[in-house]
Amino acid sequence: LINISAFVTVNNMLYAQTNYVLREPSPPQNPASVGKFQFSSPGLLSQSQEILPGIPFPKGMMLPAVTTFFELRDNVYKSATPESIEAQAVSLLKMLSIQPISGSNQALLEARISYLVGRSWNDHKDKKKAITWFERAVEAAQKMIGLEGETPTALVTLAEPLGELSILKDLGFLIKNGPKVGQYASKALESDPKNIKALLLKASALAYPPPIWGGDYKKALEIYASVLSIAQNGLPRDVLFDLRVGIATAYSNLKLSENAAWWFDAALELYPENPYAK
């Protein structure tokens, strides 16, 4: 997998950041060979303040902490230096520790923040530091499960960093823990069939690897299309970016370069500095 983590309406007529050519306002047609489904739009940005799709910030969390969370998230996607990301995260975690929010919400926020820092270190090729932060994210998610049980939110919060660790650590860890990522996503979907984060975890597991490692690019695109149909109220910026890049990657793996380029350009409208989408 490739890792694949301020509220304005998406303007479909923005100039593509890669070549400054005006992007067509609607996605290119999905070829019949890929499936009968179509992408009618690139999706919208949510107007709500959410930690994850459909999960708002806890009421006791003060506005400066919410603002700092979004700054941290966006800096990760803008490929800021991991040292600056880590410093910002440490400061934010300290800020959150004294705010009147539940232990479960503390654990959720710690898991998400730690995941973002791990992602930043991983993007900058520091495997050791990435592992440290992904492990912290897993520990926080496990604490969340201990406090509230295996809720869909807790399961996807655990599955995402565990998936990263399964790639970064040794083969034994992958064999033991890799299958759990899909299992946790499936379990989340059992009680919440429209859980967007769980669906995206499923789609990513199909969009990025080669077929020998479970890649199924047509199925991935079908899941991504279903997410867009569910997310009528929009998605957080990072989630929408990951979705667009996932669609682009699946099309790229199918050698459909026109479709892939359109979706990469759509992703760059959200984070023009992101190196993967360029």
Regions found by a protein language model. Name each.
Residues 9, 14-119, 124:
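N-terminal leader/linker segments that initiate helical-solenoid repeat arrays
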Residues 56-76, 101-123, 149-169, 194-210, ...:
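Amphipathic alpha-helical repeat scaffolds of TPR domains
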Residues 95, 137, 144, 188, ...:
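Canonical positions in the second alpha-helix
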Residues 237-278:
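Terminal, low-structured helical/coil segments at or just beyond the last alpha-helical repeat
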